[in-house]
From Swiss-Prot:
Family: Belongs to the low molecular weight phosphotyrosine protein phosphatase family.
Gene3D superfamilies for this protein: 3.40.50.2300
Pfam families per UniProt: LMWPc
Post-translational changes noted in the entry: Phosphorylations at Tyr-122 and Tyr-123 are essential for phosphatase activity.
Subunit structure: Interacts with host CORO1A.
pH dependence: Optimum pH is 6.2.
Protein name per UniProt: Low molecular weight protein-tyrosine-phosphatase PtpA
GO molecular function, one term: protein tyrosine phosphatase activity
Keywords annotated in UniProt: Hydrolase, Phosphoprotein, Protein phosphatase, Secreted
Active site: C8 (nucleophile), R14, D120 (proton donor)
Record InterPro entries: LMW_PTPase, Ptyr_pPase, Ptyr_pPase_sf, Tyr_phospatase_low_mol_wt
EC number in record: 3.1.3.48
Length: 154
């Protein structure tokens, strides 16, 4: 079993959306050896459910997010793969835990997009655009993890 964590600032918009989408894609592809989490680097939303905009877009696409609440990325977290939404998140993760054991990426490294950062829809209100960015990256991320961790698909 490998652990993957998506990380954004508040863990109410981008990273929980990515967690829910990734879980759905893993289910669709019948992959059971990847456990998905999400975390935030800021503590002001701890214990809160995903943002209303994230909930709406996930509901629109019939992707469950039951029981998800905001959690903080901590130095003691031990994830195999850590997937940040933007460069600021990468910097914060490295500051929180300068001795990371897991592999650290930005999500859009697994997309075909020119952008390198997933914009925060908390400020842009573009939840649909973020959904598209996350969805376009998840299968490539899954392919990478399956190969890297020598997992079975199906």
């Amino acid at each position: 079993m490998v652990d993957v964590a998506f990380v954004c600032l508040g863990n109410i918009c981008r990273s929980p959306m990515a967690e829910a989408i990734m879980r759905q894609r893993l289910k669709d592809r019948n992959i059971h050896d990847i456990k998905v989490h999400s975390r935030g680097t800021g503590s002001w939303n701890l214990g809160e459910p995903p943002h209303e905009g994230t909930q709406k877009i996930l509901n629109k696409h019939n992707i469950p997010f039951d029981g998800m609440i905001s959690e903080l990325f901590e130095a003691t977290d031990d994830f195999d793969y850590i997937v940040a939404m933007d460069q600021s998140n990468v910097d914060n993760i490295k500051s929180i835990n300068p001795n990371l054991k897991g592999q650290l990426f930005k999500l859009l490294e697994f997309s075909n997009m020119e952008e390198s950062d997933v914009p925060d829809p908390y400020y842009t209100n573009n939840f649909e655009g973020v959904y598209d960015m996350v969805l376009s990256s998840c299968d490539n991320l899954i392919d990478y993890i399956v190969k890297d961790a020598n997992l079975k698909e199906g």
